[in-house]
Amino acid sequence: MYLRWRRLLPRWIEVVPLELPGRGSRLGEDFVEDFDAMVSLLCGEHEVALRGNFALFGHSMGALLAWGIAQRLCATGRPLPRALLVSGSAAPSQRDPDRFVDMDDDEALIADMRKQGGTPEELFASPELLRMTLDTLAADYRVCEGFAHRGAAPLSVPLHVFAGREDDIQPWRVEAWSAETLDAGFSLDWFEGGHFFIRQHEAQVLAALVRRLPQSVAGEADVLPAIA
């Protein structure tokens, strides 16, 4: 998805996908299933991208990781992003504790995939692709299940939230993102669609992203590290 965004977004936005171990070109690597370890790994691997004129974007688990990266940068005295854009996620302090309960077998994961939508039917018909997807999803869910907010302080960063009206995430959990920033530049954009509104209404999402970024980022060489 983010590779396509490179073609669709204005040239002043450079999209830098942060690929996670066990996925894509890193398929041969072991999954990292601990949230703090994943954040630490990404901060180290992308030290150059996480400098200067950059913003962070993430969808679903990626939103949580983007927030975690911003928190880690703050804690270590490194430059903060000019903006944090999060999509399809409850606020870190208001995550549903039961969301990933009993998601430890293939049947439950497949049912959840069908419920969330956004997965091509062809994938379910391919044992190899389905196995790969289930393993990745299970690893993602273990990362999310092990996450703990620990009373992290709000960030002094503009924060922009994208959400789907038909997503299972309760609106108040999404709106709680407003407590994660001390900056006056908070916004919440709602889109039609469920958890994968980001794909269903890609043009509208990208238009909102471009609209929000200039409010927080200035210049002609802006980097957008992105995590799906």
Feature-to-residue mapping (PLM):
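Non-catalytic, mobile gating and regulatory segments of ester bond hydrolases
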Residues: 1-228
